[in-house]
């Protein structure tokens, strides 16, 4: 209790001159919307006014929401699903454009609900040349020989799916300094491939679908501003050593900054969307032209596809004009305004957030650059609370092997990103996550059932800040959560 009182006193003294920005309720500047209901994440940017642009947004929404069918479907513009896939519609992973959720405990290998999450796979026993290509940003990873780079747990009629998967949980309690306890859960994954055996050196990574809001604004944060926040060797000795991921641009054929995905493995929203079309739904695009069938998956390789033809200007299952609309839609999904930004409880919580060091990774504010393609998103002052960098989040949040055992944290798994590293996720909208989808969970694998659990899973570079939270008195914990829930 003495420690908690000392911390409380220190916070009062150090934050007495804390200044509140009177525009921060507009989390996404002029693009912010006032929505705070179940569809709060589905509105377009508030300043998107041109009828042509709104129609394009609505067109992208249609392709984002509507299910794709197995070839040959009744709607030729939306067939080609699979042969292997995780889901048949973008919206089914990104529920109402929000985040997904972890599966509840499964009683058998059939699993329960894996509709909004997936497992990525990469080998750790690779050649020197392959590792150099990853660390140079020229190659994402080396895929597992049995299930490839992503486990697809569903398949079209007549096709054998790749694997069965299930999850169970182990529970443990964490105590605050005042004696209050909270229960955390650790996922135990049960994965069994059907065609063959998953490689012994394969690293698996569970990924829940993230929220779609504000992505176009994140794309317009100046690259140098992100790079300037790097401190790879922790030269200032503050315990924080963020680094940018360097990834391959399929369009430009060059290495560039990674911005999107749990490990910042994609450079642009267009490439991110095309990657999801292929990996999650088995749909080819001009960027990713080959079906995700491995050599031994004979049924998959022989299956009919939904590719168009050159005469109709779309030789792939997702035409360029469709990818254009989905990308435009993804760029303009708006961030809701904050609801209580200037109340005493929330501003106190914001002071605590800064004092305990959360802002060292969750950088509050940026001004976006100018874009001719996206004028509404240009020159906006935004408050996403992310540095867009990779950070070591500790052993507990490190990726795992096929037996659900944590692997060595320094194994590269996605370009420069290691098994223990995750991009700092933007916090805007987090307080409405369970309004949009009551089942929504938190962190990359959804193990956290609420925001406080997510905070208490922080380790690695965030261990010190997490320990400060454990020392906070009850009232200050409530204030901290009030701030986070207002974002």
Place the predicted regions along the sequence by residue.
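Periplasmic c-type cytochrome electron-transfer domains
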Residues: 18-487
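Sec-dependent signal peptide recognition
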Residues: 2-7
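N-terminal signal peptide c-region/cleavage motif recognized by signal peptidases
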Residues: 14-16
């Amino acid at each position: 209790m003495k420690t908690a009182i000392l911390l409380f006193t220190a916070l009062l003294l150090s934050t007495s001159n804390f200044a509140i920005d009177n525009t921060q309720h507009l989390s996404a500047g002029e693009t912010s919307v006032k929505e705070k209901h179940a569809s709060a994440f589905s509105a377009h940017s508030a300043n998107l006014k041109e009828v042509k642009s709104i129609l394009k947004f609505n067109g992208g929404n249609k392709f984002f929401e509507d299910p794709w069918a197995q070839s040959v479907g009744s709607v030729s513009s939306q067939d080609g699903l699979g042969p292997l896939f995780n889901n048949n519609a973008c919206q089914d992973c990104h529920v109402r454009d929000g985040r997904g959720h972890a599966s509840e405990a499964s009683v058998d290998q059939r699993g329960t609900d894996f509709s909004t999450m997936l497992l990525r796979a990469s080998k750790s026993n690779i050649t020197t040349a392959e590792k150099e290509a990853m660390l140079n940003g020229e190659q994402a990873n080396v895929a597992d020989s049995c299930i490839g780079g992503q486990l697809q747990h569903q398949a079209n009629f007549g096709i054998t799916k790749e694997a069965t998967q299930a999850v169970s949980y182990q529970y443990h309690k964490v105590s605050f300094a005042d004696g209050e306890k909270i229960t955390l859960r650790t996922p135990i994954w049960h994965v069994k491939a059907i065609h063959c055996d998953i490689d012994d050196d394969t690293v698996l990574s569970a990924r829940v679908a993230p929220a779609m809001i504000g992505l176009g604004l994140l794309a317009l944060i100046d690259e140098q501003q992100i790079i300037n926040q790097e401190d790879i060797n922790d030269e200032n000795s503050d315990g924080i050593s963020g680094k940018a991921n360097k990834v391959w641009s399929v369009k430009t054929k060059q290495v560039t900054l990674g911005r999107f995905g749990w490990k910042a493995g994609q450079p642009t929203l267009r490439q991110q969307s095309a990657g999801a079309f292929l990996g999650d739904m088995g749909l080819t695009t001009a960027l990713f032209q080959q079906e995700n069938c491995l050599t031994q998956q004979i049924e998959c390789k022989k299956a009919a596809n939904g590719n168009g033809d050159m005469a109709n200007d779309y030789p792939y299952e997702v035409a360029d004009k469709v990818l254009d609309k989905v990308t435009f839609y993804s760029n303009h999904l708006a961030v809701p305004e904050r609801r209580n930004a200037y109340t005493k409880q929330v501003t106190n919580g914001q002071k605590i957030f800064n004092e305990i060091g959360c802002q060292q990774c969750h950088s509050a504010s940026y001004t976006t650059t100018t874009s001719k393609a996206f004028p509404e998103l240009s020159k906006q002052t935004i408050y996403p609370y992310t540095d867009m960098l990779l950070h070591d989040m500790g052993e507990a949040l490190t990726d795992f092997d096929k037996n659900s055992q944590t692997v060595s944290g320094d194994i590269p798994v996605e370009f420069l990103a290691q098994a223990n590293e995750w991009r700092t996720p933007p916090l805007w909208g987090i307080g409405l996550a369970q309004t949009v989808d009551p089942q929504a969970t938190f962190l990359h694998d959804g193990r956290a059932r609420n925001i406080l659990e997510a905070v208490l899973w922080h380790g690695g570079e965030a261990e010190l800040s997490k320990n400060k939270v454990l020392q906070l008195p009850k009232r200050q914990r409530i204030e901290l959560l009030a701030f986070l829930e207002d974002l």
